[in-house]
């Protein structure tokens, strides 16, 4: 699946930078084009993989390259006023060659949080390709302003985007990890998950069974319908499993002779369970939330893609979620020494983390100033019954 990727703000730019590094290192070629947008010159200069001519500085006359200081209303205003500058770079993308846009932003900051729904709305007005978002939730200890920014940005972005994938920093930072090191590790982990998910939709069917391989339409159909999504991931190194001394030809022979074995089936079903019940990007208990659609992707060497295991894993996910719209398939990676599983849940309602975010944001908004707002039933199902207490960004 080919993506036009847009990083918005500091965190969005860094994640797109990490995704480009992953794309180049693994040759998965999911990033057809990438650009980043920011109001801070220093953040743009710190990037390593995004080309210099694809780094767009906006708000020069308003903030002079110094950023918006966490003010996402100002971020949204500047993005709206300077949307033509962003479009000049988007015009260099061969949009007819991509399957979707992916916008990436931290929801708690200023530039990315404000720009996400603005750019999403703009792209949907101009193009027929789906426009997806990846929104990073702030940590709960970052304070009420960040939660308010995130709640308002999320509420607006859900309305403007075709789907919003959520990543919760709190669920993925390791204890005693430095802030810089923690976010760098998170960005690499995110890039891997996105690489497996969207890479699965860009496979040469000449090297894979067309009955089981996942294509771009499967991913698009899973994300169709809007709302928010979460992504689970688990992997198993084949060298670790077989022992270092059994790697190479002997390891491959053993795998080929047991493609349909109970061991191959159990490996996949175990990974599906770990991906589903482990660290989802938006932490939820699948049995305790409403899920509209889902997708199970198993990636690895073709001789390890056990059909029985994939089907059993997909069926187990159906049973756990109560959702009957769970797709399943494989992603052949001939040179890989790892079997990995990605589980995508889309159209989620009732997530405790989002209700908590809305509650903190509402409290911060009430404390800061008296506001009025509105919301529709769809937003209430995502953010909770009190979603109308929050103002959208526009």
From Swiss-Prot:
It holds the Pfam family CetZ_C. One of its GO terms (molecular function) is GTPase activity. It comes from the Archaea. GTP binds at residues 10-14, 110-112, 142, 169, 187. The gene is cetZ4. InterPro entries: CetZ, CetZ_C, FtsZ/CetZ, Tubulin/FtsZ-like_C, Tubulin/FtsZ_GTPase_sf, Tubulin_CS, Tubulin_FtsZ_GTPase. Involved in cell shape control. One of its GO terms (biological process) is regulation of cell shape. Its main location: cytoplasm. Keywords: Cell shape, Cytoplasm, GTP-binding, Nucleotide-binding, Plasmid. One of its GO terms (cellular component) is cell division site. The keyword Cytoplasm applies. It is found in: Cytoplasm. HAMAP family: CetZ. SMART domains: Tubulin. Belongs to the CetZ family. Disruption phenotype: Does not affect motility. No differences in growth rate or cell size. This is Tubulin-like protein CetZ4.
């Amino acid at each position: 699946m080919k993506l036009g990727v847009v990083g918005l703000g500091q965190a969005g730019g860094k994640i797109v930078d990490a995704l480009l590094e992953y794309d180049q290192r693994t040759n998965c070629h999911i990033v057809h084009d990438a650009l980043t947008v920011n109001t801070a010159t220093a953040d743009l200069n710190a990037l390593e993989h995004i080309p210099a001519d694809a780094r767009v500085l906006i708000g020069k006359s308003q903030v002079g390259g110094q950023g918006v200081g966490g003010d996402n209303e100002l971020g949204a205003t500047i993005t709206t006023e300077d949307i033509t500058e962003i479009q000049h770079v988007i015009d260099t993308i061969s949009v007819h060659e991509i399957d979707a846009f992916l916008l990436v932003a931290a929801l708690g900051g200023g530039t990315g949080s404000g720009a996400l729904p603005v750019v999403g709305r703009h792209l949907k007005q101009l193009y027929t390709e789906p426009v997806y978002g990846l929104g990073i939730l702030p940590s709960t200890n970052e304070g009420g302003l960040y939660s308010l920014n995130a709640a308002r940005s999320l509420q607006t972005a859900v309305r403007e985007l075709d789907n919003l994938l959520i990543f919760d920093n709190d669920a993925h930072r390791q204890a005693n990890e430095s802030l810089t090191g923690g976010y760098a590790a998170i960005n690499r982990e995110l890039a891997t998950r996105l690489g497996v998910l969207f890479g699965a939709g860009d496979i040469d069917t000449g090297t894979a069974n067309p009955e089981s391989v996942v294509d771009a339409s499967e991913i698009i159909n899973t994300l169709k319908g809007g709302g928010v999504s979460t992504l689970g991931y688990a992997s198993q190194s084949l060298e670790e499993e077989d022992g270092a001394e059994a790697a190479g030809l002997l390891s491959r022979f053993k795998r080929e002779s047991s493609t349909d074995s109970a061991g191959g089936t159990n490996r996949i079903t175990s990974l599906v369970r770990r991906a589903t019940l482990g660290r989802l990007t938006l932490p939820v208990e699948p049995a305790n939330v409403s899920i509209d659609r889902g997708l199970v992707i198993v990636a690895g060497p073709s001789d390890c893609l056990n059909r029985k295991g994939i089907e059993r894993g997909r069926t187990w996910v159906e049973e756990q979620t109560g959702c009957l719209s769970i797709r399943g398939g494989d992603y052949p990676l001939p040179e890989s020494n790892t079997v990995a599983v990605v589980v995508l849940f889309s159209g989620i309602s009732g997530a405790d983390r989002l209700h908590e975010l809305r509650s903190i944001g509402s409290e911060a908004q009430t404390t800061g100033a008296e506001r009025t707002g509105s919301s529709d039933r769809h937003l209430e199902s995502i953010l909770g019954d009190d979603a109308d207490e929050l103002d959208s960004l526009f």
